[in-house]
């Protein structure tokens, strides 16, 4: 993951490759059905949280910041000990952590299942094991960290539904695990796409995800 900070070294090559790469990422998004099992929309405004891991948290964070009903998204680490929740240590792949995002949302505006629809369809590829795109290691694994039994049931049922329908060419490898802790990442990781929209890594890997969200799920998309 550290190489992302030195991506500018390859700018000359990437300028040539960007158009092709972006097209490839855009084409990789998958249209999927709504979850058959989901929580009904709440009758009153409120605040709930979802913690999801889908590769580098920069792009996942940016996607959910553009989802209606979401009020805040923070990048962080989940799955390991709070004592090892530092970027350099997580990057070794030896801490048990996954780069994750904590999504704060209003359950009267969007359901947990609809958040998972965004997660599976445009935020990442749930069939890649311990990697996403150019990033490899267990810290880039696909995971859903549930905070209650309802979230667990919805996540497991949706994965089973999508696998049974063979929506993807390969089986979903997303882990469903109880949330032990969410450890917020360092300040420079927050709103990374907003602060570095022209960085080659962002242009190639993450901006196409926002376009996929806008085109494939227009009813859930919001401009910022």
Enumerate the predicted regions with their spans:
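Flexible coil/turn and secondary-structure edge motifs
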Residues: 2-7, 12-224
């Amino acid at each position: 993951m550290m190489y992302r900070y030195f991506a500018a070294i390859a700018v000359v090559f990437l300028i040539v490759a960007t158009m092709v790469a972006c097209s490839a990422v855009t084409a990789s998004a998958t249209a999927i059905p709504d979850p058959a099992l989901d929580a009904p929309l709440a009758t009153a405004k409120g605040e709930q949280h979802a913690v999801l891991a889908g590769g580098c948290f920069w792009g996942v964070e940016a996607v959910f910041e553009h989802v209606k009903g979401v009020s805040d998204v923070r990048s962080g680490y989940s799955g390991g000990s709070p004592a090892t929740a530092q970027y350099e240590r997580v990057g070794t792949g030896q801490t048990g952590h996954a780069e994750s995002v904590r999504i704060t949302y209003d359950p009267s505006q969007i359901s947990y299942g609809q958040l998972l629809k965004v997660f599976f369809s445009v935020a990442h590829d749930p069939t890649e094991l311990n990697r996403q795109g150019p990033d490899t290691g267990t810290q880039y694994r696909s995971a859903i960290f549930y905070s209650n039994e309802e979230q667990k049931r919805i996540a497991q049922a949706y994965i089973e539904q999508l696998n049974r329908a063979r929506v993807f060419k390969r089986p979903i490898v997303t882990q469903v695990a109880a949330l032990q802790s969410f450890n917020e990442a360092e300040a420079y990781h927050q709103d990374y796409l907003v602060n570095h929209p022209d960085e080659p890594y962002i242009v190639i890997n993450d901006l196409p995800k926002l376009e996929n969200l806008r085109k494939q799920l227009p009813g859930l998309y919001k401009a910022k």
